[in-house]
From Swiss-Prot:
Belongs to the purine/pyrimidine phosphoribosyltransferase family. PyrE subfamily. It comes from Laribacter hongkongensis (strain HLHK9). Catalyzes the transfer of a ribosyl phosphate group from 5-phosphoribose 1-diphosphate to orotate, leading to the formation of orotidine monophosphate (OMP). It catalyses: orotidine 5'-phosphate + diphosphate = orotate + 5-phospho-alpha-D-ribose 1-diphosphate. Keywords: Glycosyltransferase, Magnesium, Pyrimidine biosynthesis, Transferase. GO terms for cellular component: cytoplasm. One of its GO terms (biological process) is pyrimidine ribonucleoside biosynthetic process. SUPFAM superfamilies: PRTase-like. It comes from the Bacteria. GO terms for molecular function: magnesium ion binding; orotate phosphoribosyltransferase activity. This is Orotate phosphoribosyltransferase.
Amino acid sequence: MSDFRQDFIRFAVEEQVLRFGEFVTKAGRPSPYFFNAGLFNHGASLLSLARFYARSISESGIAFDMLFGPAYKGIVLAGATAMMLAEQGRDVPFAFNRKEAKDHGEGGTLIGAPLKGRVLIIDDVISAGTSVRESVEIIRANGAEPAGVAIALDRMERGQGELSATQEVAQKFGLPVVAIASLDDLLGFLAGSPDLADNLTRVEAYRTQYGVR
């Protein structure tokens, strides 16, 4: 396991963004863990999160010209990651959308830099793929081209069919998807964490029932 991926899982656990217990997923599945990126809700944690995104994106090798963050969680993620990339020597523009169009002031549904060139979509997770689909439509409608999708955690579980939600997005839109960490990284972290080892069996069982390889 890459050190920064393990560091991300540890960071998410420490921030209580990644929790263990009894939860129900958006798909209605009982899950032994829950990841809520909305709990990265103070300056220091957002700074660290942006650093992880920037490294994951840089190591992916995806060619892109700007970032796009779909409302609502993607808004903060795009801005924070753009700041971190700039600090590391790569200054890229970013944009995001509103859920509702504004009919005064600057108007419209888009805020930020004009969508141009190859646009990397940045979000927290991929569930049903709705956010990605809407983002792709917005980007193409503005004459730009989606370059890929960057997310925090790939749960690696089946979506509508035998593919994971991430795999479905990659197949449907022909876009690379890069995650800071995946379920494999989570399992590796649990295996090396004696204080959390009692969760390993339950997460492995969940992977066996709902996961993809």
